[in-house]
Amino acid sequence: MANPVYKILTEGAFIEARRKGHFLGSADDLRDGFIHLSLADQLDGTLAKHYAGQGGLLLLAFDPARLGAELRWEPSRGGALFPHLYAPLDLAAMLWVEPLELGKSGAHRLPKRIAA
C-alpha cells in the first residue's frame, strides 16, 4: 500500500460524513473545487496554517489507491505536491481515525502511528 493521505475534520463534520458515508468538503474545499488532503510530512504545516489552537479535530487516514483517478498531486504551499481529491471523500477508503490533541503550547500532537 502507498503512504496514506490525511484529512483533518472537526468532530461534527466527521459525524455528518459518517452518516452519509462520504465527505463533500469544507468551505475551503468547496470554494477551491477539490478536497484538500495532506501527506504525513505536510500535516504539521497544515495544522499550523489552518487549525492553530483549534480543539475538537480528528485526523482521518485514507488509502490513496482506493480514492481512484480523481486523486491528483498538485503544487501548493511552497511548491510542494499535495494530494487533491476532485470527488467526494468516500469513507470506505478510510484506514483509521484518531483525535488530534492540543499540547500545552497550543500545537497539535500527531498520533504516534504517524512517522512524519
What are the functions of these language-model segments?
Residues 1-116:
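Conserved, structured core segments of small domains
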